Amino acid sequence: DKLAEAMSSKGKVLILAHDSKSMAAKERVAGFKAELKKKYPKMSVASVYYMDNIEKLQKNVAAEINTGTYARSTDGDARLRTGDEKINPTDITEDDIIDYYLQKHPDVCGCFATNATAVKTIVSGMDRTKKDNVMVVGYDADKEEIDMLKKGKVDGLVVQNPYAMGYASVIAAARSALSMGNESVVDTGYTWITKSNL
């Protein structure tokens, strides 16, 4: 909801997920997409980048470069092909992939990142491609993310409550051991932080 508010409930969003296998990443991506579909008809997901699918994406980006349907920025990149030289998929870095997504989707207005690594990856890509008009929200709050928030490179972060998560887990385990049953969902809370409430 916070990203939708920042984007005036319209526009395209890029999702960066830290992986395609963990329950946390799957649920965050699915929940984000479901909320957009349910509440924000003028918003859509431009693409989802799963950071553990790098080999497949390296092949795709290299193929597009080699067929001429995509060109990387030439700013200081000596690895760009010249003439008939072909780019190997292994020449494509994660930075190249992020830049590819940002350049292939120039109309993206927002980005949702599923953890600290994803937040830092997209902000780094936006710095390289000089995109300063894309709203970024994500999870976690390590020192680097807080610095990005202070500088206005990140618009908001969902900060989980690790103490409550651990406490609730111990209580649930004890209740289970005593055959007392547990709630199907336990809300351990979170805090939404922005530059204004740090």
Regions picked out by a protein language model, each given a short descriptive name:
Residues 1-198:
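A residue-level marker of the well-folded mature domains of exported/periplasmic proteins
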